[in-house]
């Protein structure tokens, strides 16, 4: 479990750095627009939109920018029609990788994703080739200075499937359908949540060598830098040495 949460923290910090450069804003606006188009502009009844808005606020996006993206989504007529796509493949060392995209041009997107895999020792697979190795779940991360017994009791009572304390962090895993119930229960109890999101979580992590990790990180970075890519997931278990070097 520690491998999951540490990697999530690294991705979170990288996301904040990217946001300062303006790189991530395009992806966030795209996700907000699509979420509003699919489920309406009311955050209280649209979990996907609520999560997208939270990510945008965490990246210091202005509320006016967020509201405009929601309006475009609800209006539906303006802008390109974005389609959600998922690509599956293998990275260096046979690591399973999922790539979630939003794009208005499938041919462009698959070409760019395939190129990234090929350039860094991986290969694009077929639908279903690795997705069975992942489960869609909610992940909530909290600082360990929160009252652990209280956190555990509230989370489990609200429907969490697992709660663990690793290093300086409490990690809570939920089924998708219980994610917002658990999150709201924690927040209603005035407990501080550091990060929360729906994710594709590897059922089993695969240990990889540091050499393989370096190649894999280059692949993941290249995929995440593509405009059409929203999220990248893998089942790699990185060594403490690699995780520390990325902090």
Swiss-Prot record:
Highest taxon above the source species: Bacteria
Molecular-function GO terms, alphabetical: DNA binding
Pfam families according to UniProt: TACO1_YebC_N (PF20772), Transcrip_reg (PF01709)
Signal peptide: none
GO BP, one annotated term: regulation of DNA-templated transcription
Family, as annotated: Belongs to the TACO1 family.
PANTHER family in the record: TRANSCRIPTIONAL REGULATORY PROTEIN YEBC-RELATED (PTHR12532:SF6), TRANSLATIONAL ACTIVATOR OF CYTOCHROME C OXIDASE 1 (PTHR12532)
Listed name of the protein: Probable transcriptional regulatory protein lpl1249
């Amino acid at each position: 479990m520690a491998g999951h949460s540490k990697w999530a923290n690294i991705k979170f910090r990288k996301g904040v750095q990217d946001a300062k450069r303006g790189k991530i804003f395009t992806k966030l606006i795209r996700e907000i627009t699509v979420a509003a188009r699919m489920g309406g502009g009311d955050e209280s009844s649209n979990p996907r939109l609520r999560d997208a808005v939270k990510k945008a606020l965490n990246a210091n996006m202005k509320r006016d920018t967020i509201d405009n993206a929601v309006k475009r989504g609800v209006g539906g007529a303006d802008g390109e029609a974005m389609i959600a796509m998922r690509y599956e493949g293998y990275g260096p060392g046979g690591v399973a990788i999922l790539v979630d995209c939003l794009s208005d041009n499938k041919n462009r997107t698959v070409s760019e994703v395939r190129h990234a895999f090929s350039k860094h020792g991986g290969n694009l697979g077929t639908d279903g080739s690795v997705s069975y190795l992942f489960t869609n779940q909610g992940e909530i991360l909290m600082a360990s200075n929160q009252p652990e017994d209280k956190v555990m009791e509230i989370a489990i009572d609200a429907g969490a499937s697992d709660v663990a304390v690793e290093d300086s962090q409490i990690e809570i895993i939920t089924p998708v359908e219980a994610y917002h119930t658990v999150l709201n229960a924690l927040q209603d109890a005035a407990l501080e949540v550091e990060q929360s999101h729906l994710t594709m979580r590897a059922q089993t992590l695969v240990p990889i060598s540091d050499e393989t990790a370096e190649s894999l990180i280059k692949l993941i970075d290249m995929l995440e830098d593509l405009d059409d890519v929203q999220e990248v997931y893998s089942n790699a278990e990185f060594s403490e040495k690699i995780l520390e070097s990325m902090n």
